[in-house]
Amino acid sequence: MSLSGKDKSVVKAFWDKMSPKSAEIGAEALGRMLTVYPQTKTYFSHWADVGPDSAQVKKHGATIMAAVGDAVGKIDDLVGGLSALSELHAFKLRVDPANFRILAHNIILVTAMYFPTDFTPEIHVSVDKFLQNLALALAERYR
């Protein structure tokens, strides 16, 4: 599913609104993923605590959302812009690419909770398309 010019504009504008809360959104989204999809905890077995309130989950959630913000800036070439991150996840971290979609779903959920009025159906569809394209770009090096 490709991103239209309108989708890109909507995503950029909404990112400007949500970016001040992005670290919190990322922490909660990652914490939810680790709780609801416990098989994802295997990637973080080196952490002392993978609970949703742990400092490591909060820190990595913020790191994830910083990368999402970086991807917003590279929205016209997600595959090229995220090549190094894709390579890291494919060859070093060996993350199952299905987990990118799971995390994207959780980011959508938490974003809707943080912005119940602003996260309109139009914004929802554009952000969802963006996150799905981001997940595909991250999975690119797995081929």
Swiss-Prot record:
One of the Pfam families matching this protein, by short name: Globin
Q: Which residues bind heme b?
A: H89
Q: Which GO terms describe its biological process?
A: hydrogen peroxide catabolic process
Tissue distribution is: Red blood cells.
CDD domains xref list? Hb-alpha-like (cd08927)
Question: Record's InterPro entries?
Answer: Globin (IPR000971), Globin-like_sf (IPR009050), Globin/Proto (IPR012292), Hemoglobin_a-typ (IPR002338), Hemoglobin_oxygen_transport (IPR050056)
Q: Which PROSITE patterns match?
A: GLOBIN
Q: Where does O2 bind?
A: H60
Q: Which GO terms describe its cellular component?
A: blood microparticle; haptoglobin-hemoglobin complex; hemoglobin complex
Q: Which UniProt keywords apply?
A: Heme, Iron, Metal-binding, Oxygen transport, Transport
Q: Which Gene3D superfamilies match?
A: Globins (1.10.490.10)
**What are the GO MF terms of this UniProt record?**
haptoglobin binding; heme binding; metal ion binding; organic acid binding; oxygen binding; oxygen carrier activity; peroxidase activity
Domain named Globin is located at 2-143
Give the matching PANTHER family.
ALPHA GLOBIN-LIKE-RELATED, HEMOGLOBIN FAMILY MEMBER
Indicate the family of this protein: Belongs to the globin family.
Q: What job does the chain carry out?
A: Involved in oxygen transport from gills to the various peripheral tissues.
Q: What is the protein's quaternary organization?
A: Heterotetramer of two alpha chains and two beta chains.
Protein name (record): Hemoglobin subunit alpha-A
Q: Which species is listed as the source?
A: Seriola quinqueradiata
Q: Recall the taxonomic lineage recorded for the source organism.
A: Eukaryota, Metazoa, Chordata, Craniata, Vertebrata
